[in-house]
């Protein structure tokens, strides 16, 4: 909690927790910082395209429980898409380079465990010298958007290469009739795999209703028949590949909104509420085809859902590929920050580097950047506001919040002051008195 002062006035506001894996406030802070880092320091002013890959249920559990396998599988996916872009530009891997930034999302709209990849790819390639001795800067060459046929062929290639990768790793067993994953649990006594399996399949994990489907609310009519998607989607064996969102080179505001969207926290407080009988109600971001708009949890099962969404320790959910990788020789010449492997570009000593600007981005500046709301200026008198104290004692915070809640209740319960009589009513009364006299 932060206490601020405006000249002779005072203001108290709440700030977020620190370090929670699923805390909405901490997640929002990371969302803003990540988007600012990408737009200011990493992503160049060239067209970009978002590729989204979803995997079948068994692979979602594999990626959630074995992060090292997920990292290798993500490398397979990146190489498939990068090869597609390079070949479409009619170049080779030696003469062209591309890059991407991947956000690994672990959650779905219904708070279900759904590990999938949001990849911000260069919408083209950089042409480079094949021998690596030419000092000329890389030249960007854009490629056309993928057609529905290309998306379908690409998702089939990804599915086949991931299957071969899992067979080599000894994780996928194939026979004449079917194929299945052969997984070994790192900790057989841990309840986390049980919670993850139920979360992936939309089932209740704990309590007397264990194993049943989560209770849902259908508040709108279902959609009948097939409704074609707004943009092409490739589907194959449980995989889904979408690439319909793009940004032009000069659309930096749109790019930052996309970055904030794919880096958003798992839980949205605006969609979360309690029912009259104490159950947890969560509104879906997009209604299902059958008209489902909400999911209902018992409090204990809701906690189990949150536990399943927490990643393992020291698992990086943001990955950099190609020219954006830290060890890439081209990063120093392509990224706006001009930092990377090789000789760094000299900066003016009087200028502030992007890293220093990011370190100075306080929570007030984050609010102003995202919501265009300046917490350092009073909305009533336009006077300057400064933070005079940060409070972390739970007892003091609870006492202040209780006092503020009572103050708001008293203000709402106070009898509203009577408005002045309308001018027309006064004129009518004066006219009547005039006629009588």
Label each PLM-derived region with a short phrase.
Residues 1-437:
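Beta->alpha loop/short-helix hinge microenvironment recognizer with preference
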């Amino acid at each position: 909690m932060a206490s601020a002062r405006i000249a002779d006035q005072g203001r108290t506001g709440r700030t977020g927790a620190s370090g929670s894996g699923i805390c909405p406030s901490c997640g929002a802070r990371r969302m803003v910082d990540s988007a600012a880092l990408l737009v200011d320091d990493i992503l160049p002013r060239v067209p970009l395209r978002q590729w989204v890959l979803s995997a079948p249920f068994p692979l979602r559990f594999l990626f959630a429980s074995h992060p090292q396998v997920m990292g290798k599988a993500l490398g397979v996916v990146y190489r498939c898409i990068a090869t597609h872009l390079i070949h479409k530009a009619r170049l080779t891997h030696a003469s062209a380079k591309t890059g991407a930034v991947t956000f690994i999302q672990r959650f779905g709209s219904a708070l279900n465990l759904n590990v999938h990849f949001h990849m911000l790819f260069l919408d083209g390639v950089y042409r480079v010298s094949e021998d690596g001795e030419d000092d000329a800067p890389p030249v960007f060459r854009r490629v056309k958007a993928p057609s529905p046929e290309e998306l379908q062929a690409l998702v089939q290639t990804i599915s086949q290469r991931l299957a071969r990768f899992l067979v080599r790793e000894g994780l996928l067993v194939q026979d004449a009739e079917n194929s299945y994953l052969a997984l070994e649990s790192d900790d057989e006594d841990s309840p986390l795999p049980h919670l993850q399996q139920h979360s992936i399949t939309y089932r209740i994990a704990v309590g007397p209703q264990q194993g049943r489907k989560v209770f849902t609310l259908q508040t709108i009519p279902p959609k009948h028949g097939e409704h074609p998607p707004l943009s092409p989607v490739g589907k194959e064996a449980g995989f889904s590949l979408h690439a319909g969102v793009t940004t032009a080179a000069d659309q930096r505001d749109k790019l930052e909104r996309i970055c904030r969207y794919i880096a958003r926290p798992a839980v949205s407080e605006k969609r979360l509420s309690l029912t009259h009988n104490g159950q947890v109600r969560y509104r879906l971001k997009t209604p299902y085809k059958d008209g489902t708009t909400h999911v209902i949890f018992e409090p204990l099962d809701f906690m189990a859902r949150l536990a399943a969404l927490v990643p393992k320790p020291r698992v990086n959910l943001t990955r950099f590929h190609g020219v954006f990788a830290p060890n890439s020789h081209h990063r120093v010449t392509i990224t706006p920050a001009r930092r990377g492997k090789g000789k760094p570009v000299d900066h003016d000593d009087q200028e502030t580097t992007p890293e220093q600007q990011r370190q100075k981005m306080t929570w007030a500046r984050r609010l102003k950047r995202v919501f265009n709301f300046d917490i350092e200026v009073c909305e009533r008198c336009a006077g300057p506001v400064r933070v005079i104290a940060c409070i972390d004692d739970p007892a003091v915070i609870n006492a202040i919040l209780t006092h503020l809640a009572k103050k708001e209740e008293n203000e709402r319960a106070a009898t509203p002051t009577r408005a002045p009589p309308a001018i027309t009513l006064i004129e009518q009364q004066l006219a009547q008195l005039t006629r009588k006299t």
